């Protein structure tokens, strides 16, 4: 008996199209708003046809920022990139070395240390964030790149993922390295790192987007407008009280913040997908 799957195929494709429409429609509305002038963006209902002011709106926020005493948006983008890249490199480095030590070094209470790291996943961010802010304040790292990045470089999730991957590597690799007289760090550099390329690519993409999209942490740590990040800076563009929000410029800023993560994903999509597939095996 041959099943007729035509109905299922039509249904699945219909749901896929609806899902894409739900995701893309708000982005399209934001794009249209970014192309309008100050008058057209406040018309009710707002037009869904693109205007001609996109480059002008981008130029305005890129050079002058939005709002009183606002930093140029290019500076916010630069701060966001420095933050995201630093968090990504730091988190991967710390997590890989931590997992490597837990898996291949024999020392007392190593499993206890691992579970102490892992148990932090059970704590909500809201529980940990204010004690972390107090520590950063006591260390005089407010309004600094160090305060923005260092607390976010530790990751129980990344450590756990690398530990699980390292545990799948055969013991024969370790024995062969020992016979060749390789030191632990040489074994890590020459064998473990090359075998971890796909996992590194997947984690790089995920961690970069995580760092780029940070909103609450920069708001708590940074008061200097010249150290503000793009995602948190958009919030400052929205007026409160009787002020008027320039929504066309806010939407233009939002579109600019999409560019770096999209570029990273497109540039590394093959390695990213391969890393996710390999991690499931």
Curated annotation (Swiss-Prot):
Disulfide bonds: none annotated. One of its GO terms (cellular component) is plasma membrane. Its main location: membrane. Keywords: Cell inner membrane, Cell membrane, Membrane, Transmembrane, Transmembrane helix, Transport. Residues 77-268 form the ABC transmembrane type-1 domain. InterPro entries: MetI-like (IPR000515), MetI-like_sf (IPR035906). The keyword 4Fe-4S does not apply. It is found in: Cell inner membrane. GO terms for biological process: transmembrane transport. The chain crosses the membrane at residues 16-36, 85-105, 113-133, 142-162, 202-222, 247-267. It is a multi-pass membrane protein. It holds the Pfam family BPD_transp_1. PROSITE patterns: ABC_TM1 (PS50928). PANTHER family: ABC TRANSPORTER PERMEASE PROTEIN MG189-RELATED-RELATED (PTHR43744), SN-GLYCEROL-3-PHOSPHATE TRANSPORT SYSTEM PERMEASE PROTEIN UGPE (PTHR43744:SF8). Part of the ABC transporter complex UgpBAEC involved in sn-glycerol-3-phosphate (G3P) import. Probably responsible for the translocation of the substrate across the membrane. Belongs to the binding-protein-dependent transport system permease family. UgpAE subfamily. The complex is composed of two ATP-binding proteins (UgpC), two transmembrane proteins (UgpA and UgpE) and a solute-binding protein (UgpB). This is sn-glycerol-3-phosphate transport system permease protein UgpE. It comes from Salmonella typhimurium (strain LT2 / SGSC1412 / ATCC 700720). The lineage of its organism: Bacteria, Pseudomonadati, Pseudomonadota, Gammaproteobacteria, Enterobacterales.
């Amino acid at each position: 008996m041959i099943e007729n799957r035509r109905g299922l195929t039509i249904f699945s494709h219909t749901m896929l199209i609806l899902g894409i429409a739900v995701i893309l429609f708000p982005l399209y509305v934001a794009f249209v708003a970014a192309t309008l002038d100050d008058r057209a963006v406040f018309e009710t209902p707002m037009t869904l046809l693109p205007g001609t002011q996109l480059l002008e709106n981008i130029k305005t926020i890129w050079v002058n920022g939005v709002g009183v005493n606002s930093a140029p948006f290019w500076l916010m983008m630069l701060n966001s990139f420095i933050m995201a890249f630093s968090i990504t490199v730091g988190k991967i480095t710390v997590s890989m070395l931590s997992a490597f030590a837990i898996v291949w070094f024999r020392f007392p209470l190593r499993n206890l240390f691992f579970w102490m790291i892992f148990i932090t996943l059970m704590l909500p961010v809201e529980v940990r964030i204010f004690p972390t802010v107090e520590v950063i304040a006591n260390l005089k790292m407010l309004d600094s790149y160090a305060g923005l990045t260092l607390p976010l470089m530790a990751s129980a999730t990344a450590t756990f993922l690398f530990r699980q991957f390292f545990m799948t590597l055969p013991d024969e690799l370790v024995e062969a390295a020992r016979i060749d007289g390789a030191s632990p760090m040489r074994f890590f550099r020459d064998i473990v790192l090359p075998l971890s390329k796909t996992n590194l690519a997947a984690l790089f993409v995920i961690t970069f987007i995580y760092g780029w999209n940070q909103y609450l942490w920069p708001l708590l740590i940074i008061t200097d407008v010249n150290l503000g990040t793009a995602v948190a800076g958009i919030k400052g563009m929205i007026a409160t009280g009787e002020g008027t929000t320039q929504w066309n410029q806010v939407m233009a800023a939002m579109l600019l913040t999409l560019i770096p993560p999209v570029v990273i994903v497109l540039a590394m999509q093959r390695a990213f997908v391969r890393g996710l597939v390999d991690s499931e095996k």
